[in-house]
Amino acid sequence: MMTSDSPLLRIEDLVLHFKTSKGSVRAVDGVNFGLDFNEAVVVLGESGCGKTSLARAILRLLPRNVEDFSGRVFLNGKNVMAYKDEEFRQKVRWQQMSFVPQAAMNSLNPVLKVGDQVAEPLIFTRGVSKQEAMQQARHMFQLVGVPEGFLQRYAFELSGGMRQRAAIAMALVTTPELVILDEPTSALDVLTQANIFNVLKHIKENMETSYILITHDIATSSELAQKVAVMYAGQMVEISDAPSFFHMPLHPYSQKLLNSVPRLHGDKEPDFIVGQPPSLLSPPTGCRFKARCPFRFEKCEQEPPTFMKDGRLVKCWLHA
């Protein structure tokens, strides 16, 4: 049995490459990071950097064109990458880990009542009766702030915010230790986004659930983050506790990301990152951010290792 001092999740050298007509897409390319019990990690990065592929690699929700899938994923100290697909489905996915996919509110079945959909994972993974599953779904609705009467409604009868809450309830109904959320507020208005993050904080406090939150919404995610992982071109370039990251990020890419966020106070205008991210079909040698980095020097032609600085991890020669 794992202790509270042991990490809930530890990822080592995780690789996920896709085969396409143009070549191999290196979506996740040697990722390492971890997550403690009852901890919220926010994964930041531009669109196309591999964040969603990382989530699907952890959950083993893979398309047919996978070319390379390797590495180690330890959950409660067990390497679940060693599990066969059926064993992983029965013991891990929707049992210990669950997923709220991007645009989840649009993934609800329009011809089934919302309550039946929320209860379904519990029926299939735990074998409980529909009555028991509906009771748990009712409890989850209360937890995420959805009126009990909405159990008998269809998805098209709910607002976008309520559908998103229902999707979160579905991910929580089996009481997993880890929930991975992929852009859970991307299609919602600002007020609804704030309400969803308040729901997530409330759940974390009441259920002691750990989160991996994938987003490019830096400002809103800072309300929930305890740890921040920054992804660029398929690699983790910085991992830090949230207060240190938002006060003084270490990696040049992280600095540019924070400088792109509009400020309510002061006269400083948002900055932008010059250039385009590299293609994951043929990422450059050396540092993958070097073409856009204002601090580039000769050493950047070599692949930087991950350095430890003040308890934080950064993949940059500036901190050698």
Question: Where in this protein do the model-derived segments appear?
Answer:
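ABC ATPase NBD coupling module
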Residues: 79-98, 124, 244-249, 279-284
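Short catalytic/signature loops enriched in Gly
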Residues: 239-320
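Conserved ABC transporter NBD signature motif
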Residues: 67-79
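A short, proline-enriched helix->beta-strand linker immediately N-terminal to the Walker B motif
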Residues: 173-177
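Conserved ABC ATPase "signature" region
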Residues: 79, 131-149, 258
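P-loop NTP-binding/switch modules centered on Walker-like glycine-rich loops
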Residues: 180, 184-268
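Conserved ABC ATPase signature
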Residues: 154-158, 162
